């Protein structure tokens, strides 16, 4: 089965006032759908058409050269957004506890230090891109950023939290005020989902 746009786990207006309904609708139904359509078009008729997008990104070097750029741009866009929708919730916010909370304390210097590092990654990403909390192959937490639709999967890391800092993610509400958008994101992070992804990455 070709790649498909995943349904949002909440209504387009569910993250108001932090992320507005119109942005969510355009971002999901137009931008993400375009990545899915372009990925399917690029892979049509190839042995890779039904491979999970995460596998394609992890094995990029093994793909035919003509497929690599479409997979990075559109497969990355599909994978990144598919994660992004699920790590937000109208019941989000607060801070992580359990194993993830302890790991952030021990490896990243505590929750406030994590927020500082993650905010810096999002703020200093020039142009379009993402900020990430990832798990390395050694099982360590890493705050990183990537340009355009590049995914941490391409470097062997497993993203468990991502923030889209492309202008289409925030411009309708925040215009050029990226710092406000980043601050608002902390109010909708679903730390239970991030913790689930953390446990899965370590398994």
From Swiss-Prot:
Record keyword Membrane present: no
Cofactor note: Binds 1 Mn(2+) ion per subunit.
Induction cue: By growth in a high-phosphate succinate medium; more highly expressed in mucoid than non-mucoid cells in both Y and LTG mdia (at protein level). Part of the fumC-PA4469-sodA operon which is repressed by iron.
Catalysed reactions, semicolon-separated: 2 superoxide + 2 H(+) = H2O2 + O2
Biological process terms in GO annotation: removal of superoxide radicals
Gene3D superfamilies, A to Z: Fe,Mn superoxide dismutase (SOD) domain, Iron/manganese superoxide dismutase, C-terminal domain
Cofactor: Mn(2+)
PANTHER family the record matches: 37S RIBOSOMAL PROTEIN S26, MITOCHONDRIAL (PTHR43595), SMALL RIBOSOMAL SUBUNIT PROTEIN MS42 (PTHR43595:SF2)
Function summary: Destroys superoxide anion radicals which are normally produced within the cells and which are toxic to biological systems. Partially complements double sodA-sodB deletions in E.coli.
Official protein name in the record: Superoxide dismutase [Mn]
């Amino acid at each position: 089965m070709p790649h498909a746009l995943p349904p949002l786990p909440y209504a387009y207006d569910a993250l108001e006032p932090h992320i507005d309904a119109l942005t969510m609708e355009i971002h999901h139904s137009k931008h993400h759908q375009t990545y899915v359509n372009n990925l399917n078009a690029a892979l049509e008729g190839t042995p890779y058409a039904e491979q999970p997008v995460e596998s394609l990104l992890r094995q990029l070097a093994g793909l035919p050269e003509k497929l690599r750029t479409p997979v990075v741009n559109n497969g990355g866009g599909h994978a990144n957004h598919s994660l992004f929708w699920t790590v937000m919730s109208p019941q989000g916010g607060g801070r992580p506890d359990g194993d993830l909370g302890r790991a952030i304390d021990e490896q990243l210097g505590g929750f406030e230090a994590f927020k500082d590092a993650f905010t810096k990654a999002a703020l200093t990403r020039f142009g379009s891109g993402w900020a990430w909390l990832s798990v390395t192959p050694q099982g360590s937490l890493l705050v990183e950023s990537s340009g355009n639709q590049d995914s941490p999967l391409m470097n062997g890391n497993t993203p468990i939290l991502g923030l889209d800092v492309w202008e289409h993610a925030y411009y309708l509400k925040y215009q050029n005020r990226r710092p406000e958008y980043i601050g608002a994101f902390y109010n909708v992070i679903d730390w239970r989902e991030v913790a689930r992804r953390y446990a899965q990455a370590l398994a």
